Design a protein with these regions (language model features):
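Central cavity-lining transmembrane alpha-helices of secondary-active solute carriers
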Residues: 75-93, 282-294
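Cytoplasmic helix-loop-helix junction between adjacent transmembrane helices
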Residues: 137-174
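Extracytoplasmic gate region of multi-pass secondary transporters
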Residues: 49-50, 240-290
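Helix-loop-helix hairpin linking two adjacent transmembrane segments in secondary transporters
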Residues: 162-163, 170-222
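Extracytoplasmic
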Residues: 30-61, 153, 261-269
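Conserved MFS/SLC helix-loop-helix module at the cytosolic interface between two early adjacent transmembrane helices
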Residues: 86-126, 131
């Protein structure tokens, strides 16, 4: 049958993706750890952008157009989210066409090239060219960010079909771990009065390592291909599953409550609560790292939907409390509830 033929085609040539059950345990561990590194890299990048936002404004945009400099920061940070949304939306849909290896190589190159472009903009005179270099560089890192999410989630699900919840929780714990590392490194660079561009050089390191690991790894096909489900059938299933649309919009709101506020914590709160906002971001991310390791057992006790409901409630209370905090102690209490 057509489905059986598609299932047979899942075992492709050695140069291409293969069925997950033909991959050796050692290679599976390598794929899992390079996925963790990729998630760590995007968390690190999140912290780096928070670290350098004020420096971009002070060293480049203020000299270019003082009246619009704050808006320019918003525009270039926004470019990151545009790139993230594009590759997450279209990259996920086209993953079987391009392959997980190409997707993750693209992510590594995006972070490498994007970081170099922002450094280049910092080294040249303030001009419209410098602005567009920063914009293009952060857009590239955003495209890489989305490519990581589009590639690593189905990769881990494919190699550990019987441990999905556990393995995916561990995988996504490396996102806040990257933020903690990036935030602390940024604080250290500032305390030592070192150039802020070093934040971007640090971000290049995991990108280079990731590219090397991905280039020499053997990747599986996705679960859809392995099961023999057709491409068109996959999209038709969306229309037959109203619950998918509910979770789609729920995820949009989740991203809104986590990603956007987190990116602006340092720039928005540093002058309001009497402390560096990046410290709050590091603290919240550390809480996330710990809680994500316990998410599996909690979900089993209260159900995934129940856990999401309680998490949303705490996030709403925490974000509102953070918006009205005016000193360090209330800010830390609000951040604890949010995290």
């Amino acid at each position: 049958s057509e489905r059986e033929n598609r299932r047979v085609s899942a075992n492709e040539t050695p140069a291409g993706p293969v069925a997950a059950d033909t991959i050796e345990p050692g290679m599976k561990r390598r794929l899992f750890w390079l996925s963790n590194l990729a998630i760590f890299m995007i968390g690190l990048g999140f912290a780096v952008r928070a670290n350098i936002a004020a420096d971009l404004q002070g060293d480049i945009f203020n000299l270019l157009d003082l009246a619009r400099s704050a808006s320019m920061v918003g525009e270039v940070i926004g470019a990151t989210f545009i790139g993230f949304a594009l590759t997450l939306l279209f990259g996920s849909a086209l993953l079987d066409r391009v392959g997980m290896k190409v997707m993750l190589l693209f992510a590594a190159v995006g972070y490498l090239a994007g970081s170099v472009m922002v450094i280049a903009a910092a080294l040249m005179e303030a001009s419209s060219s410098a602005y567009w270099l920063v914009y293009g560089g952060l857009l590239l890192t955003g495209l890489g960010w989305g490519a990581v999410e589009a590639g690593t989630n189905p990769l881990v699900a494919a190699i550990y079909p019987d441990e999905k919840t556990h393995r995916l929780n561990i995988l996504h714990a490396w996102w806040p771990a990257g933020i903690v590392a990036g935030g602390l490194l940024g604080l250290a660079l500032g305390a030592l009065s070192l150039p802020w561009e070093l934040n971007l050089l640090i971000l290049i390191l995991p990108a280079v390592v990731l590219a090397a690991l991905v280039a020499t790894a053997k990747f599986p096909v996705t679960e859809r291909v392995a099961a023999g489900v057709g491409y068109g059938e996959m999209f038709r299933e969306i229309g037959r599953s109203p619950g998918f649309l509910i979770w789609f919009f729920a995820m949009m709101m989740t991203a809104t409550s986590e990603l956007a506020p987190g990116q602006w914590v340092d720039l928005a709160l540093s002058n309001v609560v009497g402390m560096q906002g990046i410290i709050l971001l590091v603290y919240v991310s550390a809480l996330m790292f710990v809680m994500r390791h316990f998410a599996g057992p909690l979900a089993e006790r209260v159900s995934p939907v129940g856990l999401l409901w309680f998490s949303s409630l705490f996030a709403a209370i925490g974000l509102y409390s953070l918006s009205v905090a005016s000193s360090p102690l209330p800010a830390f209490i609000a951040a604890t509830i949010w995290g």
